Design a protein with these regions (language model features):
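Glycine-rich, low-complexity segments
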Residues: 1, 271-276, 283-312, 317, ...
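Glycine- and small/polar-enriched repetitive beta-structure motifs of secreted/surface proteins
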Residues: 1-291, 295-299
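Active-site-adjacent substrate-recognition loops and nearby beta-strands
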Residues: 300-309, 327-342, 365-367
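C-terminal intramolecular chaperone/auto-processing assembly modules
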Residues: 302, 309, 361-419
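Stable alpha-helical elements in mature extracytoplasmic
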Residues: 316-319, 345, 382
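Acidic, glycine-rich loop-and-strand cores that form catalytic or ligand-binding grooves
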Residues: 316-327, 332
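Active-site and glycan-interaction determinants of carbohydrate-active enzymes
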Residues: 348-365
Length: 419
């Protein structure tokens, strides 16, 4: 029905065809089971079968493509041999030529798709610039709009992954999630504006609104929690908790663990160090800022089989006599035991027993490393000092006994002389 609709067809070379509209199915020869509805819809179709094309110029250039559904003005207009596609909306899949198995729903969704296969683009301009990227799912207005060749991506949310061009195997879920990603790959961003400024960063996981917001090129980071990892660029970091790792200005760090916005747990993954209630491990494998306790005593390996160069400890008493015990108050009682404390001055102990003092100098960031004392290591020294003192005491006792015996003998001798 319509002027020159199905003009090239005869009743003997096609079947079950419906052509309605000016020059609809104009060049159809043997294509069967087609429905072309609208001016010039399916105009150049020759042998393509089982197509449904509804709208002005819809599927205009289709020749042999079959099993397509194009609905909307100029939807799938340039498709020639592509098959098993569903394009719904104005200019949806407009430039598709030989793409297969695509679903584009929304005005200009998949507009530039040329030969890419098995994509699902839902939303106005979703996947608009895609030409060869395959196996993508873009859902939301302008989701994946600039994607050209990136493949295996899932972008869900308005403007999610809008600037992605070549990045692949990314999952962006949330409004503007991964907004500026261009070539970054294998990222998972979930939450509004999650990973918003990421451009080339790879293998990141950002979960939570604004998480990893300002990361651009950092790789292998895990930020979980609203605003986690804001203003951070770096690699191999783990931030867990709302606002954890949120910095007021641009910040770069690598290989760090942060749990809780107040640094409840902090780790230096490259140095195998862990700190609690602070973001400074003070060059120690395990550091607690504040009071710590437990239900069982602290155990330290001491098996003889683990040791070498074993020698008795000498001069312990003299070392102990040189130590000066003090009472003191910490300047910062927020992170230290409040009130009066008992201890030593580390710098003084270092002059006497350097083996029990660590610290000093500066860390890789230029921060001062405070001295600390291994108080438990003083125990063997105190034991040996007591033993030395006991030995001296025994010697004095023996000497005293001898003196007492001599005095007693002299007293007897004097008494005999006086008789």
């Amino acid at each position: 029905m319509g002027n020159e609709a199905g003009k090239g067809s005869t009743s003997s070379n096609y079947s079950n065809a419906i052509f309605i509209g000016y020059q609809a199915g104009y060049n159809n020869t043997t294509g069967s089971n087609n429905v072309f509805l609208g001016t010039n819809s399916g105009r150049t179709n020759s042998t393509g079968e089982s197509n449904v094309m509804i709208g002005n110029l819809t599927g205009y250039n289709n020749t042999t493509g079959g099993s397509n559904v194009f609905i909307g003005d100029q939807a799938g207009k340039q498709n020639t041999v592509g098959y098993c596609n569903v394009f719904l909306g104005y200019n949806a899949g407009y430039k598709n030529i030989k793409g297969v198995g695509n679903v584009f729903i929304g005005d200009e969704a998949g507009y530039s798709n040329d030969s890419a296969n098995f994509n699902v683009f839902v939303g106005i301009s979703a996947g608009h610039d895609n030409t060869s990227g395959k196996n993508n799912v873009f859902m939301g207005t302008s989701a994946g709009k600039a994607n050209i060749s990136g493949e295996g991506n899932v972008f869900m949310g308005n403007c999610a992954g809008v600037y992605n061009t070549t990045g692949y195997y990314n999952v962006f879920v949330g409004g503007a999630a991964g907004f500026r990603n261009t070539s970054g790959q294998s990222n998972t961003f979930m939450g509004n504006l999650a990973g918003y400024y990421n451009t080339e960063g790879q293998h990141n996981v950002f979960i939570g609104d604004y998480s990893g917001l300002d990361n651009t090129t950092g790789e292998r980071n895990v930020f979980i929690g609203s605003h986690a990892g804001n203003n951070v660029n770096g690699n191999d970091n783990i931030y867990l908790g709302c606002g954890t790792g949120y910095f007021s200005s641009a910040h770069v760090e690598n290989h760090r663990l942060r749990i809780g916005s107040n640094n409840l747990i902090y780790g230096e993954l490259d140095n195998n160090r862990v700190a609690i209630n602070t973001d400074n491990a003070n060059n120690l494998t395990f550091y607690v800022n504040g009071l710590a306790g437990g239900t069982n005593p602290w155990q330290s390996p001491s098996d003889k089989r683990l040791k070498t160069n074993i020698k008795p400890l000498h001069g312990a008493l003299q070392c102990v006599l040189k130590l000066q015990g003090i009472t003191f108050n910490w300047k910062d009682e927020t992170n230290h035991r409040p009130g009066q404390n008992i201890g030593f001055i580390a710098q003084e102990v270092k002059e006497i027993l350097p083996e029990v003092v660590s610290g000093g100098g500066k860390d890789e960031k230029g921060n001062e490393i405070y001295y600390s004392i291994e108080y438990a290591t003083l125990t063997p020294l105190l034991v040996e000092a007591i033993k030395e003192l006991n030995e001296e005491n025994q010697t004095l006792n023996e000497t005293n006994k001898k003196l007492e015996a001599r005095i007693e003998a002299l007293e007897k001798l004097i008494q005999e002389k006086l008789k």
